[in-house]
Structure formats: structure tokens, C-alpha cells
């Protein structure tokens, strides 16, 4: 693998069997699979100055490993995904825990046995917990919609508390919505965990952090003799698309194209911009060993920011006397501003607009949109990895 800033003079896309746009999970997984499985020569074009997409991590001035685009916590139920990624990293045994700051009191989320006693007091909290156990059993996640369906005043009390203090104000900040705009089906999925496990992903069999960090994972994944990586390259400057062909640098390209960027930007927003939420991230390095007891604290009833992440709590890095935290402020995304589009706003009219963009490439048999931006959806890291593995299998099958 070579990683180069910019394209070399005389770059010839035709010398490659596949062009991958984007060096995040979707792009890197496809590049590796096609290179090692059927011997494709692959060029990866990355708009940013680094690989690893939003999972990119780096060391800050204090020597602390930070996640530049917000916290990324690896967890999966998918053994195929875990086995594939484990080829490129060893994992720590980090088990992610999240606390909600509810009116100054830190409570575990998802809401659990301990949370109930903190919220309602020991005696009342225990009564409510026993009612949950009797109704649903132990060690299960129960959406608050299910609590309300039971028409039980005790269960409704729990549902109302969780809705108001864990979900409502946090969601209003995260999505910029008023309560009447929040989809009731989303509200109803907010869970209560009937048990004592205070991990955020209590049932995921595979979880942890890459021992050397995410960027190192991607370096290992892309380290193949048939893969070349070109950073600081915007594919929009190279691509010309009509109904049946893609031209790169003015020449029709006949190889496979895996595209992981935003479809609307590829077409210069001709049909309109796809709406997203973005984040302002404020990093602060503090002269202390530890700022908070867990990796993430959500501010569900107060503050303008949605959450604070403390990276040392997640990475296990030992660096006495210094710690770096990050506060997240959610806001609407402005196309062309240099902001990062993080969360697709999955309203029906936005999905319809995306489908119209998708129609623009439906006759391009060698053009494969995959990933969070190209598919206009929310993906956890394991899910996008699985999607890229599936796409790779499809391409391999077509050329077997």
C-alpha cells in the first residue's frame, strides 16, 4: 500500500480494476476484499487528508489519543464482521458505560435497576423494579411503549420518567425538534433494561476498542500490494456521470466503482440538498487525571451540549495529570460549509429525494453506492462493515 497526498502526474484510472471513493469502513473493506480475493488493483480516493473516515483517531498536543469526529465504540453481534476486523487489530476488553446527568445526578443508561433507585429512592425504586421483573423477566430490554401498553400505573410512571428525563430534552437538542415533531415510533423504542448490568451494550458478545486505535486498524486493512491510497483528492473533480457511463479524467471508466460519499454532492445538489445534522465538537485538555467516571455522560435535562466524552476512560491510556474531554453541540448541517454531515434526517420527503438521486445512477452497472453517506442512512460501524462485505461478495460473484 502507498498513501499519497494528491494524485501523481499522469494518474491513469484505467490502470486500476476498481476505484473506491472514500477510505472509511465501507471503502476500506471493499478495497481489501477485492484486492486479496480476486487480485483487483484498487485505487482509493479520499477527500480528507487522512484515512479511516469518521473513525479517525490521533494523538493531541497533550499526548492523548482522541477520536477526531466523536466517540466510536466497537460492538457487534455479527461474528463474520468481528472475525474480519480482528485480522487487522487486537481488541481491548473495554465495556462501554454511559451515564445520564439528570438534574445533577448521574444515572446509568439504558435505565436499569440502579437508575430506578437513584430516580425514585431505594424503596420506591425497588418496588418498581420488582414490578418490571414480574412483568417482563430479568436481563431484558423493554421499550417504554411496551410499558405503556400494560395499562399499569407503576409501569407508566417509569415510562413517563424515562421519556421526560432521559429521552425528550436530549432528543430535542440532538435533532432540533420540538416534542410534537418527534416521531412517536422513535419515542416508543426508548428502552429500560430490567437488570443490574450497567453496560451500554449489555448483550453484545463482541465489544472493545482496537488496541492501537482505529487509524492503525485502517492502516493494516489497506496495507496490501494491490491497493494505492490517494488522500486530498475530491472525486467530484474527476468524475463525469451520464445515464450509462462514468468518465474519470475525461475517459470512460470500465472497472468497478465503489462510491461512499454523498450522492447529492456528486450531482452538485442539482435536485436539492439532502438534510443532515452535524456536530460542533469542543475539545478541552484539563490538568487532572480524570474528569468523569465513564467514557460518556449524556446531558439529558441541562446544558446546550448533548454529551461529554472523556477519551482516556475509553482507550485505557495512562497519562497522569492530563485528560482530554470533548463536548458535542448538535446543529443543522449547511452544505458547502466544510461541516461534516453526521446524521441523515430520515423524514419521508428526504428519503424520496435520496431515491431521486439514486435513480441517476441506477443504469450504471459498475457504480456501487455503499455506506452511511452514499445510502443516506445511519450505520453503526459493524453494520457498514457487513454491508461492505456483502457488496464485495456480489462483485466477486459477478467476476468469478
Describe each region flagged by the PLM.
Residues 62-135:
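Dinucleotide-binding Rossmann-like beta1-alpha1 core, especially the glycine-rich loop
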Residues 52-54, 102-103, 108-110, 175, ...:
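Short catalytic/ligand-binding loop motif for oxyanion handling, primarily in non-cytosolic enzymes
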Residues 340-400:
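C-terminal catalytic lobe of FAD-dependent flavoproteins
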Residues 35-61:
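Glycine-rich FAD pyrophosphate-binding loop
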Residues 103-107, 113-253:
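Active-site/ligand-binding neighborhood in enzyme catalytic cores
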Residues 37, 237-360:
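Mid-domain catalytic core of redox enzymes
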Residues 1-14:
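A short, basic/flexible loop-to-alpha-helix module at the beginning of a structural domain
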Amino acid at each position: 500500500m502507498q498513501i499519497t497526498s494528491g494524485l501523481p502526474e499522469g494518474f491513469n484510472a484505467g490502470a486500476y480494476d476498481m476505484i473506491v471513493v472514500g477510505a472509511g469502513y465501507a471503502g476500506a473493506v471493499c478495497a481489501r476484499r477485492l484486492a486479496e480475493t480476486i487480485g483487483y488493483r484498487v485505487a482509493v480516493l479520499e477527500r480528507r487528508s487522512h484515512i479511516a473516515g469518521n473513525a479517525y483517531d490521533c494523538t493531541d498536543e497533550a499526548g492523548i489519543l482522541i477520536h477526531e469526529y466523536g466517540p466510536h465504540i466497537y460492538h457487534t453481534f455479527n461474528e463474520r464482521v468481528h472475525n474480519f476486523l480482528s485480522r487487522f487489530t487486537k481488541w481491548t476488553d473495554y465495556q462501554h458505560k454511559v451515564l445520564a446527568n439528570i438534574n445533577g445526578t448521574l444515572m446509568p443508561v439504558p435505565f436499569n435497576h440502579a437508575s430506578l433507585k437513584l430516580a425514585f429512592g431505594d424503596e420506591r425504586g425497588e418496588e418498581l423494579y420488582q414490578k418490571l421483573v414480574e412483568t417482563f423477566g430479568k436481563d431484558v430490554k423493554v421499550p417504554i411503549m411496551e410499558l405503556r401498553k400494560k395499562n399499569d400505573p407503576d409501569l407508566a410512571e417509569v415510562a413517563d420518567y424515562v421519556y421526560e428525563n432521559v429521552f425528550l430534552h436530549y432528543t430535542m437538542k440532538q435533532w432540533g425538534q420540538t416534542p410534537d415533531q418527534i416521531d412517536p415510533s422513535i419515542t416508543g423504542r426508548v428502552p429500560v433494561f430490567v437488570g443490574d448490568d450497567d453496560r451500554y451494550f449489555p448483550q453484545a458478545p463482541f465489544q472493545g476498542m482496537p488496541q492501537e486505535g482505529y487509524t492503525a486498524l485502517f492502516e493494516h486493512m489497506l496495507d496490501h500490494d494491490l491497493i494505492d491510497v490517494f488522500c486530498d483528492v475530491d472525486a467530484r473533480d474527476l468524475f463525469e456521470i451520464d445515464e450509462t457511463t462514468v468518465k474519470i479524467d475525461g475517459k470512460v471508466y470500465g472497472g468497478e466503482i465503489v462510491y461512499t460519499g454523498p450522492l447529492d454532492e456528486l450531482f452538485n445538489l442539482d435536485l436539492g440538498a439532502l438534510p443532515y445534522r452535524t456536530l460542533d465538537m469542543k475539545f478541552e485538555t484539563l490538568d487532572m487525571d480524570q474528569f468523569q467516571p465513564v467514557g460518556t455522560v449524556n446531558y439529558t435535562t441541562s446544558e446546550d451540549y448533548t454529551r461529554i466524552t472523556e477519551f482516556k476512560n475509553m482507550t485505557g491510556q495512562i497519562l497522569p495529570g492530563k485528560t482530554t474531554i470533548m463536548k458535542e453541540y448538535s446543529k443543522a448541517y449547511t452544505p458547502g460549509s466544510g461541516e461534516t454531515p453526521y446524521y441523515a434526517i430520515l423524514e419521508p420527503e428526504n428519503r424520496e429525494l435520496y431515491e431521486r438521486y439514486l435513480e441517476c445512477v441506477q443504469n450504471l452497472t459498475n457504480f456501487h453506492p455503499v455506506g452511511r453517506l452514499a445510502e443516506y442512512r445511519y450505520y453503526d460501524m459493524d453494520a457498514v462493515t457487513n454491508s461492505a462485505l456483502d457488496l464485495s461478495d456480489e462483485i466477486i460473484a459477478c467476476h468469478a
